[in-house]
Amino acid sequence: FTWTVISKATVFAPEKQEGICSICGAKQSRDNGSKLTATMKLNVTSIKLQKKQSTTKVKVTGLANGDSVKSWTSSNKKIVTVDKNGKIKAGKKTGSAKITITLKSGKKATLKVKVQSAKVKTTKITGLKTKLTLKKGKSLTLKPVISPITSQEKVTYTTSNKKVATVTSKGVITAKKKGTATITVKSGSKSKKLRSQ
């Protein structure tokens, strides 16, 4: 028999193989190995929201083949609600609730949500290099990581020398001529500086 894979393993079934007899041409199928273990990862385990604020920034990744998100549920709908696509919305009250994400395989993950009266402020800015080297005419987009992901404070970009490097409101740096410029990335009271040369 010569065996070939006809379907890959999923969380519900092992790999399926089909075999063909090289002499008589008869076909046979078999399972190979076992079904996959359900896995999932959340990009955060807890979030803060201001009253009436909503977010779609909570992401589920790392699912095993064949698995998918079945439901998002809230432990207290007066505090926070969530729709089938994972859009989380704070209500009019402050307090805490838990969001449970359930996969079709049955695996679950929990996200803690705290609803507050105050605006959600930026606590840190990461994901940026301190130095950038760009050739004249070349551009690069900055991708700062703002914590918490639900911060309501806008990200702004400024340059110390527009003749050397410009930066747009979307964080696109363009080198204009040889020299050094300081790019400042700011969100609320937090800021990060990087040198472009």
Regions found by a protein language model. Name each.
Residues 25:
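Cys/His-coordinated zinc-binding microdomains
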Residues 29:
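Short functional micro-motifs and their immediate structural scaffolds
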Residues 1, 14-16, 22, 36-197:
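Extracytoplasmic soluble-region selector
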Residues 1-10:
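Short recognition patches in nucleic-acid-associated and regulatory proteins
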